[in-house]
């Protein structure tokens, strides 16, 4: 799209919301059209730019998408599963595209998203980082070459405030590896170990989770054999990498037909 894409950001007052506002401010082809917070928030009425530390943008934080119907083309949501479903329903009814960076959806919620995406364009990805999406391609290659004769473990770490575990990114890593190897992740995943577990089953994919301090996001996939191991690691040092990816997705999405897309498609990696 040649012109600017207008975005709305829900959860504007949160850590990720403020980062998204800052990212939008610095993007040549993106313009912040609306910023939304929950009803009753003390941030309602505050200038979104001042909230994010980039100066006045003349976009005031509102407490409902209904007040911003004509102000944006794409909604960006990094909130919570229940809220994201409500926001997507709103987007369908008002013919708006949506970028979803929320993680932690259950099976029923994913089915709802699939159904809604038949009516409006949606990008949903557990991680919007370019580096992470490239990592998933590297995992396919590693699994293809080494997966059948190595022990596979996925280790991830995030800040103390993250609510879901393992992270959506870690689960996606497992899905990529399992699919490449022809395995069912639901049957081969092992989430943490405790007590006398017995000898490791080569067919399993292990997950370990760390929650500590202000870790932005660290993910490692380990392919371990006797005598050597391969580790593929991505470390995010700032939420800005996720925010910039979301803006890239929004700019790409506005010209797409209804459907459910991911960052691999946005980045042309498929």
Curated annotation (Swiss-Prot):
GO terms for molecular function: 4-hydroxy-tetrahydrodipicolinate reductase; NAD binding; NADP binding; oxidoreductase activity, acting on CH or CH2 groups, NAD or NADP as acceptor. InterPro entries: DapB_C (IPR022663), DapB_N (IPR000846), DapB_N_CS (IPR022664), DHDPR_bac (IPR023940), NAD(P)-bd_dom_sf (IPR036291). Keywords: Amino-acid biosynthesis, Cytoplasm, Diaminopimelate biosynthesis, Lysine biosynthesis, NAD, NADP, Oxidoreductase. NADP(+) binds at residue 38. NAD(+) binds at residues 11-16, 37, 101-103, 125-128. (S)-2,3,4,5-tetrahydrodipicolinate binds at residues 159, 168-169. The active site is at residues 158, 162. It is an enzyme of class 1 (oxidoreductase). Transmembrane segments: none annotated. It catalyses: (S)-2,3,4,5-tetrahydrodipicolinate + NAD(+) + H2O = (2S,4S)-4-hydroxy-2,3,4,5-tetrahydrodipicolinate + NADH + H(+); (S)-2,3,4,5-tetrahydrodipicolinate + NADP(+) + H2O = (2S,4S)-4-hydroxy-2,3,4,5-tetrahydrodipicolinate + NADPH + H(+). GO terms for biological process: diaminopimelate biosynthetic process; lysine biosynthetic process via diaminopimelate. Pathway: Amino-acid biosynthesis; L-lysine biosynthesis via DAP pathway; (S)-tetrahydrodipicolinate from L-aspartate: step 4/4. One of its GO terms (cellular component) is cytosol. Its EC number is 1.17.1.8. It is found in: Cytoplasm. Belongs to the DapB family. Catalyzes the conversion of 4-hydroxy-tetrahydrodipicolinate (HTPA) to tetrahydrodipicolinate. This is 4-hydroxy-tetrahydrodipicolinate reductase. It comes from Shewanella sp. (strain MR-4).
């Amino acid at each position: 799209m040649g012109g600017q894409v207008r975005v709305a950001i829900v959860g504007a007052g949160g850590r990720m919301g403020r980062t998204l506002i800052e990212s939008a401010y610095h993007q040549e082809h993106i313009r912040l059209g609306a910023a939304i917070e929950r009803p009753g928030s003390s941030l309602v009425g505050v200038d979104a730019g001042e909230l994010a530390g980039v100066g006045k943008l003349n976009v005031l934080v509102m407490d409902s998408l209904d007040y911003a119907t004509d102000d944006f083309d794409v909604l960006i949501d990094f909130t919570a599963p229940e809220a994201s479903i409500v926001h997507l329903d709103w987007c369908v009814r008002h013919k708006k595209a949506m970028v979803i960076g929320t993680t932690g959806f259950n099976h029923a919620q994913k089915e709802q998203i699939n159904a809604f995406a038949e009516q409006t364009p949606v990008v949903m990805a557990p991680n919007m980082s370019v580096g992470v999406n490239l990592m998933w391609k590297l995992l396919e290659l590693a699994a293809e070459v080494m997966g059948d004769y190595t022990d596979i473990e996925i280790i991830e770490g995030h800040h103390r405030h993250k609510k879901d575990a393992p992270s959506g990114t870690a689960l996606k890593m497992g899905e990529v590896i399992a699919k490449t190897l022809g395995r069912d992740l639901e049957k081969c995943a092992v989430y943490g170990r405790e007590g006398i577990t017995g000898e490791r089953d080569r067919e399993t994919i292990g997950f370990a989770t760390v929650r500590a301090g202000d870790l932005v996001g660290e993910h490692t996939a380990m392919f371990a054999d006797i005598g050597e191991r391969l580790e593929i690691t991505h470390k995010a040092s700032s939420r800005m990498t996720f925010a910039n990816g979301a803006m890239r997705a929004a700019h790409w999405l506005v010209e797409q037909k209804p459907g459910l897309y991911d960052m691999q498609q946005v980045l042309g990696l498929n």
